[in-house]
A protein has these predicted regions:
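Gly/Gly-Pro-rich "capping" loops immediately C-terminal to redox-active cysteine motifs
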Residues: 33-40, 44, 56-86, 96, ...
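C-terminal motif of bacterial Sec signal peptides marking the signal peptidase cleavage site
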Residues: 17-20
């Protein structure tokens, strides 16, 4: 039986290969490790990991702004979008994502997110022949006039539970004046909210809202905030692993 040890020794390399033990220390492999988190520049991967929870799958139907709305994409320029992503929005749940502000995204990754949103959701002709109202809320505004405009242009949809939710001090403490204005101007087609023209809103006057009208409506909604309501802290950015 002297041949038996020799046969086992000869068969040992084959057994290793068949058993999956071929990847021993120092062995070459066609399988590469995944990239480090700060090296990921793929837009779908970055969006799904960092944005989807608040802004929804595919940029819509989330609790935060509908990023897939072409009107929103047309109204906000790259610099403002970059500043919001990088530094967050104080008083809201939008956190700062830039590493320079305590977040976990590099400048290159933020640029990749912006470029990806533009490629996927922007439509350069969305406002062809139309001049939309200013996107940012100015100081001031006539809250009393805004209340009248709200009744004429908004109340037919925002009634009952919907109205209570919109004018809830808790909700209003979570959303900035600029965010309220952006929703009125750009609309939220994912949830049926029309834009400032509200030409698809049932029962609403068909005359578009002016920039001053929107300023006054936002001033009215802002007046309903409870000063004692604590503003929401930004959602914490998960630590880098």
């Amino acid at each position: 039986m002297r041949w038996f040890p020799i046969a086992v020794a000869a068969a040992f390399p084959l057994l290793l290969a068949l058993s999956g033990c071929g990847h021993l220390p120092g062995a070459t492999s066609d399988v590469y490790p995944p990239p480090r988190p700060d090296q990921v520049l793929d837009f779908p991967a970055l969006y799904n990991q960092n944005c989807q929870a608040c802004h929804g799958t595919g940029g819509e139907n989330g609790p935060a702004m509908d990023l897939a709305n072409p009107e929103f994409q047309a109204l906000i320029d790259d610099n403002r979008l970059r500043n919001i992503i990088s530094n967050g929005l104080p008083g809201t749940q939008m956190p700062a994502w830039a590493q320079s502000a305590g977040g976990m995204l590099t400048d290159q990754q933020i640029d990749a997110i912006i470029a990806g949103m533009r490629k996927e959701w922007a439509r350069p002709d969305v406002f062809a022949g139309v001049t939309p109202p200013p996107f940012q809320q100015p100081a001031g505004g006539n809250a009393q006039h805004g209340s009248q405009l709200y009744q004429a242009h908004c109340a037919m949809c925002h009634t009952g539970p919907a109205r209570q939710q919109l004018i809830s001090p808790v909700y209003l403490s979570l959303v900035s004046d600029d965010a309220l204005r952006s929703i009125i101007v750009a609309g939220r087609p994912d949830i049926g909210q029309p834009d400032w023209r509200h030409d698809d809103a049932k029962g609403a006057p068909q005359m578009p809202l002016s920039g001053q009208d929107i300023t006054d409506i936002v001033a009215y909604l802002g007046s309903l905030r409870n000063p004692s309501t604590v503003s929401a802290a930004p959602i914490p950015v998960p630590p880098r692993r």
